[in-house]
């Protein structure tokens, strides 16, 4: 089985490029490798009807649904737009992701 490589990590700021939340930005909460998805904070909100269980009341709950990883791009704060990332090696030998346009490092 192949390991999937994602250009996005938990905690990254991303921008949605297609769908109902197009051009909105948010922070990645979780990566879902089996579904090729990402959960983005405050985006792709869906309503779920839940049944009461124990102490939890039932009702309609709004929560984030996964977006396909191909529908989001890294957001560069310096460029202030969605950008592609490339790998670069720093002077100390550490590999980081950098903005293709301006060279700003995403990994600190």
UniProtKB/Swiss-Prot annotation:
Gene3D superfamilies with a match to the protein in the record: 2.30.30.30
One Gene Ontology MF term: rRNA binding
Record InterPro entries: KOW, Rib_uL2_dom2, Ribosomal_uL24, Ribosomal_uL24_KOW, Translation_prot_SH3-like_sf
Keyword match Ribonucleoprotein: yes
Protein's GO biological process: translation
Disulfide linkage: none
Keywords: Ribonucleoprotein, Ribosomal protein, RNA-binding, rRNA-binding
The keyword Ribosomal protein is assigned to this record: yes
Transmembrane segment boundaries: none
Superkingdom in the source lineage: Bacteria
Annotated Gene Ontology cellular component terms: cytosolic large ribosomal subunit
PANTHER family: MITOCHONDRIAL RIBOSOMAL PROTEIN L24
Cited function: One of two assembly initiator proteins, it binds directly to the 5'-end of the 23S rRNA, where it nucleates assembly of the 50S subunit.
Sequence similarity: Belongs to the universal ribosomal protein uL24 family.
Oligomeric form and interacting partners: Part of the 50S ribosomal subunit.
Name assigned to this protein: Large ribosomal subunit protein uL24
Organism (species): Geobacter sulfurreducens (strain ATCC 51573 / DSM 12127 / PCA)
């Amino acid at each position: 089985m192949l390991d999937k490589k994602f250009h996005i990590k938990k905690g990254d700021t991303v921008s949605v490029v297609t769908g109902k939340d197009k051009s909105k930005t948010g922070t990645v909460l979780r990566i879902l490798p089996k579904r090729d998805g990402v959960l983005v904070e405050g985006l792709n909100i869906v309503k779920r009807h839940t049944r009461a269980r124990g102490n939890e009341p039932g009702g309609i709950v709004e929560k984030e649904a996964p977006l396909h990883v191909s529908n989001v791009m890294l957001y560069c704060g310096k460029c202030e737009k969605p950008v592609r990332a490339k790998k670069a090696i720093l002077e100390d030998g550490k590999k980081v992701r950098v903005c293709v346009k301006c060279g700003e490092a995403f990994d600190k």
